[in-house]
Amino acid sequence: MSSIIPAIPDPEILTVYGTTRCGDCHRTRRYLDGTQTPYRWVDLGQDDAARDMLHANGLLAVPVVVLPGGRYLVEPSDPELAAALAAS
């Protein structure tokens, strides 16, 4: 799991940053939906400020999954996401 991104506010709910054209973003959302994990979706194609914030932190790949507490994963596999959720 990656460290905390200083410029990203600590979310109260798991937050997924991605785009509608991203296959990994769809897979991540399907996984979260399938496990009934509540999350907030931020479409970077519609939210320029969020996209700029991620880019300013060197995060150019999606999805970026930010967990409560501020830790984040970039392009996590389903097993990586499951482990992060179990640890949070």
Model-identified regions with their sequence ranges:
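Non-catalytic, surface beta->alpha helical segment in thiol-disulfide oxidoreductase systems
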Residues: 67-88
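Local sequence-structure signature of Cys/Sec-based thiol-disulfide redox active-site neighborhoods
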Residues: 2-37
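Thiol-based oxidoreductase modules, predominantly thioredoxin-like and allied folds used
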Residues: 37-50, 61
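Short Asp/Glu-rich motifs
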Residues: 51-52, 73
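Structural micro-motif
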Residues: 57-65
